[in-house]
């Protein structure tokens, strides 16, 4: 199973966020081989079985339709079934910047986004998904550390710095507080303002 998250056990962080934040509607964009999906779904399982919540997780990817590095939808489904998590997540094929149209404004509690992220991807995310996140909701975005901005493919293809966008983007500055977990590949956590103050970093 491929994931840059594996080395520093980011899966446990994702699961913990789900359990702590208790989202009713969680969405993931970017699945690859399903590492993050498995851990998010494990969190959803806890919410349903321990807390009696009716939480949902929908995970989107282009899978075989993506010409570069991609996972196979059927294989990811097999992983989920093998872990007993298949009933806690719905895998869907879809484009990252089209499927936001499936959701009403303010309807998403937690969004995990990991699609070869760079600064331009983050800008596009804020333009398209921001209104879909409820006040007090959270966006988990792979990347955000200085080290992550310097990786080989970011430099080779002259990709825009994620960190620069975090510091300068108007929507982020006005509507979110954020923190970055620095261990590679890093994870940016953006808390949308306006909800319960205990859900935001001061």
Where are these regions (language model features)?
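S-adenosylmethionine/decaboxylated-SAM
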Residues: 11, 15-202
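Conserved SAM-binding loop and adjacent beta-strand
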Residues: 1-11
